Every structure is written in structure tokens, then in C-alpha cells.
Amino acid sequence: DTFDISGLRYHRIIIMTDADVDGSHIATLLMTFFFRHMKEVVEGGHIYLAKPPLYLLKATGNKKWYAYSDEEKDNMISELIEKRQSNGAKINPNDSPMKQAGLNDIQRYKGLGEMDADQLWETTMKPENRVLIQVKVEDAERADAIFSKLMGDEVSLRKSFIQTRAKDANFDELDV
């Protein structure tokens, strides 16, 4: 069977994966699949990656913010501290940054499965709030090249890839 793009109904294929490394691997596999077997969909700009948040920051009064990376979370905390200081709040430097920012809780999402249906809708699916990244041909080509290198028949490519990156491995981020 061959793929016929004229049968594409909604003109958007949205890939939803977790915000962690495992989710990135799955997205790479799916982009490679579309690039290899349904290239017209990629070339036509129909593939999107949904970007779920990694953190939920909560403060009193039902105030909440979503952060999509560790860096964004840290920046939000710093901005909240600065805002509180400029509004005259007394900040105890001995308190945790979370408390200094006036936050009650910081929740890290380990995956989409940890969100209830309302959270998933509000953060990742609701058109007004969601963050979508359109996959470009270059993205799919890069994913295909990495996939071929890591999963292909040529052991020497995989070995070289691992050897050049092993020294940069962050063992704290390994999911073991």
C-alpha cells in the first residue's frame, strides 16, 4: 500500500509525548516513521509536536504557572521573588527559593499519564493554551539520521556516536 495525502482529513497530526528524555525518544521514532513512510505529510507541514509542561507552580489564591523546562521553572521562581520584593514583601534569605517566591507547591510531571483529564486538556490540548511545534523537513531528516545511526545495521556508527558522547553523559539524568 502507498500513502495518499489527499486522504488526510484534518491536516494536522499532533504527536503527544512526555516532556522527558523518554518522550523525546518516542517523538524521534515517530518523526522518523513519518519521514520514511509518509514524507508528504512532513513536507506539507502537517506534523506537530505538542509540548506538555514539565512543572506546575502553585501559589495561594489558585494562582498557577506552567514551566516547560528546568530553566524556565528557575526563571519563573526568580521573577516571582523579584516581583514580591518590588511589591514590598519581606523575603527571608534563609527560606527556600520556593518559599521566597510565595509558592505553596511545585509539581513535576513525570509524564502525560500523571495528569488528570482536565490538566491534560488545559495544558496540552486546549487550542488557546497548548504549545505546538511544527516539525520541519530538517527536523525529520535529523531524527532519521540519528535513528539510522543508533538503530541501524552499522555497528561502527553507533560505537562512534556513543564514544564521542559518553564523556558528556549526566548520570543523574539516567532513568535506571
Q: Locations of the language-model features?
A:
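Conserved phosphate-chemistry cores used by DNA topoisomerases
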Residues: 1-176
